[in-house]
């Protein structure tokens, strides 16, 4: 670069695969080496400028990845699609960048709607296979796969997964949507393949530990529904070992869903997003909701619409018992009666 001439800043997206055995997870920390730290140091050396990557999924210590996503900004003139090849020559052999390409400056891997897919592998036989020991959980007790599938079915859909997460210091919304949860048996290998809108801290590992309990006969399959209802970590099974877990992929939505529906025993709602792009407007119909869940549902779904680009969100509670109070703060949002639509309340970003 010529002195005094500033190159154009560009944002580069990476698809990162790694064997997490020797790393203390993704995120930089004091007590050990991490994937993020190695990427930052290697990119800084390659591009001759300070680099700090932003990762989509902050996997835990010992967890593997086939397709985590990261981005960084650089002024270096190296073509974005060539960075992966140069980077892989410098990275340790247990980390590889599968793809690098330029993306728009406002692209953020954590703020885009995406479907995350994980796999949890269980070797179910009397004697452990040495070649699988770093990438699977070993269980010598015979597991009933059909019962595991029955138990897994209760977890599909939108639920409060508070029972299936390890508590952390900060308060966290615990409602998530699981789109699919398959229990696949191939010889002695059982694979749990799970896709969802996002996952709580240790959620997949606790689901794996719970379904193994079901497979052992310690819990009947229907007990999984009782665990969900308890909303208490102590109700669920143990947290399975990190080494069996692999982040498989992150699939980002290219188009905004026109309509989102959520339904379970506790609530049912429809979020209409078809006017967000044209008019900055979304509508939320709450068909039914338990009183104790109402405020959380309201805040969470309105926030989702705002995150997706809505400037105004109109809400109607079809049970109509005065649960939306004009002027009262609901998280970051305050509602007023919508002058143009009787029975609707509106909040603005």
Model-based region annotation:
Residues 2-268:
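Structured-RNA-binding interfaces characteristic of tRNA pseudouridine synthases
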Residues 186-188, 280-282, 342:
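Beta-strand-connecting loop/turn residues
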Residues 269-278:
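Short beta-strand/loop segment at the start of cytosolic alpha/beta domains
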Residues 278-289:
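N-terminal acidic leader/helix
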Residues 295-303:
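A short, charged, amphipathic alpha-helix used as a generic interaction element across diverse proteins
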Residues 302-338:
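Acidic, low-complexity, intrinsically disordered interaction modules
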Residues 334-349:
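C-terminal edge-of-domain segments
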């Amino acid at each position: 670069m010529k002195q005094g001439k500033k190159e154009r800043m560009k944002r580069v997206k990476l698809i990162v695969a790694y064997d997490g055995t020797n790393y203390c997870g993704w995120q930089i920390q004091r007590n050990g080496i991490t994937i993020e730290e190695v990427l930052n140091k290697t990119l800084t050396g390659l591009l001759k400028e300070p680099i700090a990557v932003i990762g989509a999924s902050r996997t835990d210590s010992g967890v593997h990845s086939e397709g985590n996503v990261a981005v960084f900004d650089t002024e270096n003139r190296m073509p974005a699609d060539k960075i992966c090849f140069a980077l892989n020559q410098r990275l340790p052999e247990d980390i590889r960048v599968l793809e690098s390409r330029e993306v728009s400056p406002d692209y953020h891997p954590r703020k885009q709607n995406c479907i995350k897919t994980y796999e949890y592998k269980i070797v179910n036989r009397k004697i452990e296979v040495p070649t699988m020991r770093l990438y699977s959980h070993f269980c010598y007790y015979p597991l009933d796969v059909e019962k595991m599938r029955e138990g897994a079915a209760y977890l599909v859909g939108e639920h409060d997964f508070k029972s299936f997460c390890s508590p952390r210091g900060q308060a966290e919304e615990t409602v998530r949507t699981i789109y699919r949860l398959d229990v696949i048996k191939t010889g002695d290998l059982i694979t749990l393949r799970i896709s969802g809108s996002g996952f709580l801290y240790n959620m997949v590992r606790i689901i794996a530990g719970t379904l193994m309990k079901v497979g052992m006969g310690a819990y009947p399959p229907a007990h999984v529904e009782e665990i969900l209802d308890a909303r208490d970590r102590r109700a669920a099974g143990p947290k399975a070992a990190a080494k069996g877990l692999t982040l498989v992929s992150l699939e980002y939505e290219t188009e905004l869903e026109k309509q989102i529906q959520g339904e379970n025993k506790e609530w049912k709602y429809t979020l209409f997003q078809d006017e967000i792009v044209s008019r900055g407007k979304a509508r939320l119909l709450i068909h039914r909701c338990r009183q104790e869940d109402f405020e959380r549902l309201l805040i969470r779904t309105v926030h989702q619409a705002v995150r997706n680009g809505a400037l105004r969100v109109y809400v109607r509670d079809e049970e109509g018992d005065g649960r939306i109070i004009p002027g009262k703060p609901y998280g970051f949002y305050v509602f007023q009666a919508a002058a143009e639509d009787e029975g609707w309340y509106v909040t603005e970003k």
